[in-house]
C-alpha cells in the first residue's frame, strides 16, 4: 500500500522539464505518412500475407498431428516437430541468411524470392506426404525445416526492407517517419495472427474437428480413427493450399511493386545525406 501511495506521489510531484519544442504526429498523420510511402505499404502488405500463411499452418499443425497422423503418441511427434522447426527458424536467421547474403552474394530481394519459393516447396512436399499417407514424423520434418527456415529468413529480410523505406519516405515526403514505419511491423503481425486464427477456427468448424478438440484430452487415444477421410483431406488442403496461394500472391505483389534495390537504396541514402548537409 505504501509503495502505491509513494509511487502516485512521485508521479504527481516530479515532472520532467522539457526544453525541446517537438512536433508530434497525430494518428491521422501517421496513417497519411504510411499511405504516402508506397514502398512501406508494399512491404506491410507483404508482411501481412506472408505471416498469415505461416500462422494458418502453425494454428492447424497440432490438429494435423492429432487427427490426421494420429496414433497414441501423436503429442510426442508434435513436440519434436515444433522443436526442430523452432531451432531451424533461429539457425536460419543466424546462419542461413548471412550465408546467402555474404558467401553466395545474393541481394536481399533475391534472398526473399528464394525464401518464399522454399516455403512454397515445403508446403507442396507436406501436402504430397500427407496425401500419400505418410504417418511418421521424421519425413515430415523435411517440409517443416523448409517452411521454418523460410520464416526465419523472412524475419530478417522484412526488417531490412522496412528500414529501406525510411529514407525513401524522407526523400519523397520530406518527413522521416521512422517510428511510424517500424511500429507498423508489430501491428501487421498481430493483424495477420488474428486473421489466421479466424481462418483456422472456421476450418475446424466446417471440418467438424472443433468439437472433437474440445471434448477429449486423453493422450492414450488415437483420435484419427474417428475422423473421416474427407475431414482429413480438408485439413490438409486448408493448411497447405491457402498458405501457398498467399505466398504466390505475396511474391507477385512484391515483385511488381517493390523498387528499392541495393543500388537504389544507396542512391536514395546519398540524396538524403546531401539534402540534410
What label would you give each PLM region?
Residues 1-277:
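Membrane-embedded alpha-helical bundles of multi-pass transporters/translocases
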Amino acid at each position: 500500500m505504501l509503495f502505491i501511495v509513494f509511487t502516485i506521489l512521485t508521479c504527481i510531484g516530479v515532472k520532467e522539464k522539457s526544453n525541446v519544442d517537438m512536433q508530434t504526429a497525430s494518428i491521422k498523420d501517421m496513417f497519411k505518412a504510411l499511405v504516402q510511402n508506397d514502398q512501406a505499404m508494399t512491404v506491410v502488405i507483404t508482411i501481412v500475407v506472408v505471416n498469415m500463411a505461416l500462422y494458418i499452418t502453425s494454428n492447424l499443425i497440432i490438429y494435423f498431428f492429432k487427427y490426421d497422423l494420429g496414433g497414441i503418441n501423436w503429442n510426442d511427434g508434435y513436440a519434436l516437430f515444433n522443436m526442430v522447426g523452432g531451432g531451424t527458424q533461429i539457425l536460419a536467421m543466424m546462419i542461413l541468411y548471412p550465408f546467402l547474403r555474404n558467401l553466395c552474394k545474393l541481394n536481399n530481394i533475391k534472398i526473399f524470392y528464394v525464401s518464399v519459393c522454399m516455403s512454397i516447396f515445403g508446403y507442396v512436399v507436406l501436402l504430397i506426404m500427407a496425401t500419400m499417407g505418410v504417418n511418421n514424423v521424421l519425413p515430415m520434418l523435411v517440409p517443416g525445416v523448409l517452411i521454418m527456415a523460410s520464416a526465419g529468413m523472412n524475419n530478417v529480410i522484412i526488417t531490412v526492407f522496412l528500414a529501406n523505406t525510411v529514407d525513401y519516405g524522407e526523400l519523397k515526403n520530406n518527413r522521416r517517419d521512422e517510428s511510424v514505419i517500424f511500429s507498423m511491423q508489430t501491428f501487421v503481425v498481430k493483424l495477420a495472427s488474428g486473421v489466421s486464427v479466424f481462418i483456422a477456427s472456421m476450418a475446424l468448424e466446417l471440418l467438424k474437428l472443433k468439437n472433437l478438440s474440445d471434448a477429449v484430452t486423453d493422450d492414450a487415444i488415437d483420435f484419427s480413427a474417428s475422423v473421416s477421410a474427407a475431414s482429413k483431406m480438408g485439413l490438409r488442403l486448408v493448411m497447405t493450399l491457402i498458405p501457398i496461394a498467399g505466398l504466390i500472391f505475396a511474391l507477385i505483389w512484391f515483385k511488381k511493386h517493390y523498387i528499392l534495390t541495393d543500388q537504389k537504396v544507396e542512391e536514395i541514402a546519398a540524396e538524403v545525406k546531401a539534402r540534410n548537409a
